[in-house]
Swiss-Prot record:
Belongs to the herpesviridae CVC1 protein family. One of its GO terms (biological process) is chromosome organization. This is Capsid vertex component 1. It comes from the Viruses. Keywords: Capsid protein, Host nucleus, Late protein, Viral genome packaging, Viral release from host cell, Virion. Capsid vertex-specific component that plays a role during viral DNA encapsidation, assuring correct genome cleavage and presumably stabilizing capsids that contain full-length viral genomes. One of its GO terms (cellular component) is viral capsid. Disulfide bonds: none annotated.
Length: 474
């Protein structure tokens, strides 16, 4: 596979281990490979289990495989490579590999996580010799005689009982035909005797007269002369189908299968896990899902803080809401106030349970850390009535408002153009659906059906911003 070959050429000098993978598209939720080019890039980061720090991003090549571009017998999926580093010649099984596939014009970025344990266990298994080779030592076969060597050395392939008379006749006949062994010619006597015209063995063993320069013996015919390569291209290796070995692995976070591609017999069997050096008491303190739980808890905490800020704003305004968008409520509810209250209560409950890495507040935090501007919209369905949209970037021709006041939302709605021109109104005109408008200033507004808006805010420390940008930044 060309992608595996190129990744190996570009990255194998800067990493300790490189794993070549084929990942099925259904394992990468939200990939939409049909909207991407056949060859594209993705970003790889590693989250260290012990320090919870994220490595520098590495951009690797990926390819959508099909019937024309296959990996062995595989005709679908995404082929890519993962360059990895060791720590003191050991690897931690619970480090997390974070793959980020960039957003497209119509879809958000998507993330896939792998444990070191999954990848390295596959490498070790693939690098180990087959079981039959371990249990059954190789059988030594008796050496086979080469008839050509026998002819050059003056031996006959058929052996007869040797008598003094037959021995003398054989020796005499041999001397008459080819002479002594030391003066034997390598070319026919009717032709020129110079070996330079017919080729010579390495080192000019025979002189121009045809006699040997070495005393007593002719080099064996099966000895090959040493050749020195003119060009040695270190770091270039073409992976072919004949070298390929596919090893199925299971993605432990989803239970789906993907494939490890082994092209060369590298010695991965000597890779050592750092857990091998820990005592039994130390092993009991390890939580394999620590990083996953911390990231999920962090996202949930931020959403809870936002909902708390909404409730504080409502209490400060004595639970009075203002309608900022002139949208009628499309509902058969007899009491509009009770209807809006019901939508608000369900919105608070849903927001506390909803976490998404493509949420507008995540993109706003990344923009704040990198000193960029932007406005994003999250459309969230209530009562599980549909599928929402996360982190929709709103393009504005004029300078972006900071969304500090209600007037900013009205101004923003008037500036939207193209496919987003009536986006806010269309979202607020539907039942069982809410929207959250996010700004790079970390202000956020909850938009309810009917165009009612409540102001909230996300509060991030410097450590929080670094945490978000290191994981979800480009």
């Amino acid at each position: 596979m060309d992608v595996h070959t190129n990744n190996w050429r570009y990255f194998h000098h800067g990493c300790d281990v490189m794993a070549h993978l084929v990942i099925p598209e259904d394992l990468i939720e939200g990939l939409y490979a049909e909207d991407r080019p056949k060859i594209f890039s993705c970003t790889l980061k590693v989250i260290d289990y012990q320090t919870n720090l994220v490595s520098e991003p590495v951009i690797v090549w990926a390819r959508s495989i099909d019937h024309r571009h296959t990996v062995g017998t595989l005709t679908s999926g995404i082929a890519l490579s993962i360059p990895l580093l060791l720590t003191n010649d050991t690897w931690h099984p619970f480090n997390i590999i974070l793959l980020r596939f960039a957003e497209t014009a119509n879809h958000n970025a998507c993330y896939v996580r792998f444990f070191y344990q999954t990848i390295f266990s596959g490498l070790i298994k693939a690098g180990a010799p087959p079981v039959e080779e371990v249990n059954h030592p190789p059988v030594e076969l008796p050496p086979r005689e080469d008839p050509l060597v026998n002819i050059l050395q003056g031996r006959s392939g058929r052996q007869f009982p040797a008598t003094e008379e037959s021995t003398n006749d054989h020796t005499a006949s041999q001397k008459l035909v080819i002479g002594e062994a030391a003066s034997a010619y390598l070319n026919h006597r009717a032709l020129e005797r110079s070996p330079s015209l017919r080729g010579a063995l390495a080192g000019e063993i025979f002189s121009s007269s045809g006699a040997s320069n070495l005393s007593g013996s002719v080099p064996p015919a099966n000895r090959q002369a040493r050749r020195t390569a003119l060009v040695n291209l270190v770091g270039t290796k073409d992976f072919t189908k004949d070298m390929l070995r596919l090893l199925p692995l299971t993605h432990c976070l989803s239970g789906k299968r993907f494939w490890l591609c082994m092209y060369n017999p590298e010695g991965y069997k000597n890779l050592v896990s750092c857990l091998n050096h820990l005592s039994e008491d130390e092993l009991k303190k390890i939580n394999p899902l620590s990083i996953i739980q911390q990231d999920t808890s962090f996202l949930t905490l931020k959403m809870n803080q936002f909902v708390d800020s909404l409730l504080e704003e409502c209490r400060a305004a004595n639970f009075r809401m203002q309608q900022v968008l002139g949208v009628a409520i499309r509902s058969d509810a007899s009491n509009a106030l009770e209807y809006v209250q019901e939508q608000f209560y369900e919105a608070c409950f849903t927001l506390r349970c909803a976490t998404n890495e493509n949420s507008g507040w995540v993109k706003a935090a990344v923009a704040t850390q990198s000193r960029k501007q932007g406005v994003w919209l999250d459309v969230i369905s209530l009562w599980d009535q549909g599928v929402g949209s996360w982190g929709v970037s709103l393009k504005l021709p004029n300078p972006l408002p900071g969304l500090h006041t209600l007037a900013c939302i009205q101004q923003l709605s008037c500036q939207l153009e193209g496919k987003h021109k009536y986006l806010l109104e269309s979202v607020c005109a539907k039942d069982d659906q809410i929207a959250v408008l996010h700004s790079h200033t970390l202000n956020a507004w909850l938009l309810l059906p009917g165009g009612f808006a409540i102001k909230g805010k996300f509060t991030h420390s410097e450590k929080d911003l670094l945490h978000i940008s290191s994981r979800y930044g480009v």
